[in-house]
């Protein structure tokens, strides 16, 4: 399959998720000429803001954070070489749910309260429009248990299946996605990245053992080397300035909790549906489009 023929769709919950988990993958395939689409389910209105400059944007104050984060997402995707952002059923249709048990999760517009048939139909429409060869979203736990990530997993899984059938006829002609992946963090790779951290801002701290989410190495099916685009990934992280701070080294970042994390140079995935392409000696793919033909 030629690079220009490749089509990749990523479904993420909030602005910044696309860069933190899959930024290198987006940049790598975009740089190779693939058509990369990022579909974001909410505006991230409930995000915790870093610093005082944007503190008044939060939900309890001006409630303007979501609109501001559209601009951050646009800048991040530009840094990664991807197309302009797309939002599920249009920007603002679904609101960031925050965490389970918080007042924001009870909002009728919260993504966690979405009518599943409506949300699935909206993803089906995008799949049938762009006809991706590869779709990526989260694993069943949403990576770290956030309800919006879990919801994104559920609706994307249902949509990939439904898009190949006669369901939702109003959403276009059926399309069967050849390969469907979950984005994950490999445990040993994360541990090596943390061990390599030697300097970081004095108000940051190293994570406690097991504090950052990861999966067993044996669960990983696919490893994408993103060293060649790591600077683009760092620039995209910096674009999400209300949520992310990149260390002066350019090799680490932290969220509002000031827990330092490595900017990983290999991004990992689990093939959830489809056929594994060619693998290396470790049994892992090195190309999301491996085994596919135009």
UniProtKB/Swiss-Prot annotation:
Name of this chain's protein: 1D-myo-inositol 2-acetamido-2-deoxy-alpha-D-glucopyranoside deacetylase
Binding site for Zn(2+): 14, 17, 149
Record carries keyword rRNA-binding: no
InterPro entries listed in its UniProt record: GlcNAc_PI_deacetylase-related (IPR003737), LmbE-like_dom_sf (IPR024078), Mycothiol_biosynthesis_MshB (IPR017810)
First-tier enzyme category under EC: hydrolase
Pfam families to which the protein is assigned, alphabetical: PIG-L (PF02585)
Domain of life: Bacteria
Keywords linked to the UniProt accession: Hydrolase, Metal-binding, Zinc
Purpose: Catalyzes the deacetylation of 1D-myo-inositol 2-acetamido-2-deoxy-alpha-D-glucopyranoside (GlcNAc-Ins) in the mycothiol biosynthesis pathway.
Lineage: Bacteria, Bacillati, Actinomycetota, Actinomycetes, Mycobacteriales
Catalytically driven reaction(s): 1D-myo-inositol 2-acetamido-2-deoxy-alpha-D-glucopyranoside + H2O = 1D-myo-inositol 2-amino-2-deoxy-alpha-D-glucopyranoside + acetate
UniProt-recorded Gene Ontology molecular function terms: N-acetylglucosaminylinositol deacetylase activity; zinc ion binding
Cofactor: binding details: Binds 1 zinc ion per subunit.
Protein family (similarity comment): Belongs to the MshB deacetylase family.
GO biological process, one term: mycothiol biosynthetic process
Cofactor(s), names only, from the UniProt record: Zn(2+)
EC number of the protein: 3.5.1.103
């Amino acid at each position: 399959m030629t690079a220009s023929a490749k089509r990749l769709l990523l479904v993420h919950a909030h602005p910044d998720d696309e860069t933190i988990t899959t930024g290198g993958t987006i940049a790598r395939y975009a740089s190779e000429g693939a058509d990369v689409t990022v579909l974001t389910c909410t505006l991230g209105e409930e995000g915790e803001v870093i610093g005082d400059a944007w503190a008044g944007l939060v939900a309890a104050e001006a409630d303007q954070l979501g609109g501001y984060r559209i601009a951050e997402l646009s800048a991040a995707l530009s840094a990664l070489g991807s197309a302009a952002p797309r939002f599920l059923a249009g920007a603002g249709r679904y609101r960031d749910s925050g965490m389970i048990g918080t007042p924001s999760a009870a909002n009728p517009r919260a993504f966690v309260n979405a009518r599943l048939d409506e949300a699935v139909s909206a993803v089906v429409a995008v799949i049938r429009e762009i006809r991706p060869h590869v779709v990526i979203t989260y694993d069943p736990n949403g990576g770290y248990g956030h309800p919006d990530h879990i919801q994104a997993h559920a609706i994307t899984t249902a949509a990939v299946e439904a898009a190949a059938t006669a369901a939702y006829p109003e959403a276009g002609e059926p399309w069967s996605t050849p390969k469907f992946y979950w984005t994950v963090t490999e445990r040993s790779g994360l541990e090596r990245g943390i061990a390599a951290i030697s300097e970081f801002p004095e108000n940051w701290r190293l994570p406690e053992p097991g504090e950052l989410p990861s999966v067993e190495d044996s669960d990983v099916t696919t490893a994408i080397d993103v060293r060649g685009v790591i600077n683009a990934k760092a620039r995209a992280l910096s674009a999400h300035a209300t949520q992310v701070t990149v260390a002066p080294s350019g090799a680490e970042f932290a969220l509002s909790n000031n827990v330092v994390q490595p900017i990983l140079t290999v991004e990992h995935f689990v093939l959830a549906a489809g056929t594994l392409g060619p693998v290396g000696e470790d049994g892992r793919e090195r190309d999301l489009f491996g085994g596919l033909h135009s």
